[in-house]
Regions:
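Conserved phosphate-binding catalytic cores of ATP/NTP-utilizing and phosphoryl-transfer enzymes
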Residues: 3-16, 117-150
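Short glycine-rich, Thr/Ser-proximal phosphate-binding strand/loop in the N-terminal lobe
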Residues: 12, 16-62
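Short amphipathic alpha-helices and their capping/turn segments at secondary-structure boundaries
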Residues: 60-72
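Short beta-strand-loop/turn "lid" adjacent to the catalytic site in phosphate-handling enzymes
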Residues: 70-117, 122, 126-135, 152
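Extended, Lys/Arg-enriched charged tracts that mediate electrostatic binding to polyanionic substrates
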Residues: 156
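Active-site histidine-anchored catalytic micro-motif
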Residues: 159-161
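Conserved small/polar residues in nucleotide/adenosyl-binding loops
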Residues: 166-168
């Protein structure tokens, strides 16, 4: 297997405490994995091409192997996967990939850790209230309106859409 295409290695203070969480953003082209702290900070971000691994479980295993030199051992306390496809039941079939994600298989691969799934653009919708004003780019004419819904469109391997009724 070839090496990951992108890596951002930060300090990992949670490693010493032993507790950590895995977060992932998995699309039809790329899978990004990271460690999330209790405070919500993200570190040790690693990106793999979906074509590098025959399954999501094997990509997760490769990521876990990458964490060992940074003080992480074992498996996470919990994992959350933002997935490019409809979330229905235990399995998610990706819109533009041959991978199939299963909560039960991923939980077994993670030593019994709790595993949660959400759609990748639903994850963006959940993140909107946590953005700073410097994270926003005004598009089109006129001023932004605080009390209006927010729409997010994202071209990738497919086209993601999110409507957030959370007003900021």
């Amino acid at each position: 297997m070839e090496a990951p295409t992108d890596k951002v290695i930060d300090s990992a203070p949670e490693a010493a405490a032993g507790a950590w969480r895995l977060v992932a953003d998995v699309g039809g082209t790329n899978a990004r994995f990271a460690v999330a702290s209790n405070e919500g900070s993200i570190s040790l971000v690693t990106r793999y091409s979906v074509d590098q691994h025959p399954s999501i479980e094997q990509a997760v295993s490769a990521f876990l192997d990458e964490l060992a030199p940074h003080g992480y051992s074992g498996t996470p306390d919990a994992a959350c996967f933002a997935l490019a496809g409809p979330i229905e039941g235990d399995e998610v079939r990706f819109t533009n990939s041959t991978w199939v994600a299963s909560r039960s298989r991923l939980s077994r691969a993670l030593g019994g850790s709790a595993v949660d799934f959400l759609n990748d653009f639903a994850a963006i919708g959940h993140a909107i209230p946590h953005l700073e004003s410097s994270d926003w780019i005004q598009m089109g004419g006129g001023a932004s309106r605080v009390d209006y819904p927010i729409v997010v469109l994202g071209p990738g391997t497919g086209l993601g859409v999110c409507l957030s009724l959370i007003h900021i």
